[in-house]
């Protein structure tokens, strides 16, 4: 079985696992006036209970792990909030390693779930390195924000909703980031709707084609 088919089927399993714990978010039409015959929609994942799509992957992963297993992850905010919420719901012990300069609102949100926090000097990459090192001691199981099949499969559940909400969809534009979101959604959509195009979007590519709104 190829990787796209594997992820699509795993996302279907994840969908049943997390269905009652997430919001099936709506698609809103854009206010932009585009070429005639083109309809543009936005998937409102900001409506999720933790404010982002990350809750899908977090629940998909954590619900499969024994409650006796101590968990650790690294985050610049949204993944940490999602894992903290999921761990609170499932009764897991979770530690989140965050960059020292993480936003105050995200830090407070994570602590609000009773999660243990480690503030690490440097950026999110160094926070991830710290979390991996702590996991290597054997005390914790590490939860990657993006490089994990269960996480990717959870994010892929968005793909099923898109296909149901917007039948015969032509193109799907997905932010790339660490790759988990586009891998999950892309696998589901290409498996069930092979003619639909998947276009990855990154900040660097956007800035090459469009001037920044704010300097």
Regions from the PLM with identified roles:
Residues 1-215:
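PLP-dependent amino-acid enzyme catalytic core
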């Amino acid at each position: 079985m190829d990787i796209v088919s594997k992820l699509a089927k795993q996302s279907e399993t994840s969908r049943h696992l997390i269905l009652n714990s997430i919001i099936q978010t709506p698609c809103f039409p854009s206010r932009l006036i585009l070429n005639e015959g083109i309809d543009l929609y936005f998937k409102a994942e900001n409506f999720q209970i933790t404010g982002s799509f990350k809750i899908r992957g977090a629940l998909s992963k954590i619900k499969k792990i024994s409650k006796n297993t101590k968990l650790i992850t690294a985050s610049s905010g949204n993944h940490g909030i999602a894992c903290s919420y999921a761990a609170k719901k499932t009764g897991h012990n979770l530690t989140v390693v965050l960059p020292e300069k993480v936003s105050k609102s995200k830090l407070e949100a994570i602590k609000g779930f009773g999660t243990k926090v480690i503030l690490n000097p440097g950026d999110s990459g160094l926070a991830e390195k710290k979390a991996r090192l702590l996991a290597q001691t054997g005390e914790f199981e590490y939860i990657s924000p993006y490089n994990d099949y269960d996480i990717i499969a959870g994010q892929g559940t968005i793909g099923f909703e898109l296909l149901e909400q917007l039948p015969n969809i032509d193109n799907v534009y997905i932010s790339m980031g660490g790759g988990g979101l586009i891998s999950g959604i892309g696998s589901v959509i290409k498996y069930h709707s092979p003619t639909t195009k998947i276009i990855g979007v990154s900040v660097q590519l956007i800035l090459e084609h469009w001037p920044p709104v704010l300097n």
